[in-house]
Amino acid sequence: AADAKGLLKMACRMDDPVIFMEHKGLYRQGYAATEEPDADYLLSFGKGRKVLEGDELTVITWGAMVQKSLEAVQSLEIQNDSVEVIDLRTLNPLDMDLIETSIMKTSKALVVHEDNITNGPGAEIAAIIADKFFELLDGPVRRVGAKDSPVPFNWIIEEEILPQTVD
């Protein structure tokens, strides 16, 4: 909640056009509630945050997929220090310094997003990572995303299309 407030307040102060999108799935989620740092809290665009420290795999994600990624790491019962999870917070600009620092450490990248696996923002982020950090990678950038289908209105079918913790 603090991130959303800080980003929205920053967007209101910008002279440029801004598209601010919130994920409805984060509303009323206990894990999304945070204390307000202070009334004047601002969060700069292009500044991600490291949510989980690790040294074998970098998971690059944002929005509701941050929590799903953390749940996936916990459900795999792997060493806590093997997966690094990065919350981008903003897609444009990207926090390239944070991404590079993490990939330098892990040499592997997995982009997790809720949009279609084909032509979604994760595909573009994976392409940017492959272009800029090819020499740092031990293999191809992998992606987890929604099945290539329109997202249905029925929540049961929606869960079949959108990425889940087990994916």
Where are these regions (language model features)?
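Conserved thiamine diphosphate
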Residues: 1-14
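Residue-level detector of structured alpha->beta connecting loops
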Residues: 15-16, 107
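Thiamine diphosphate
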Residues: 24-167
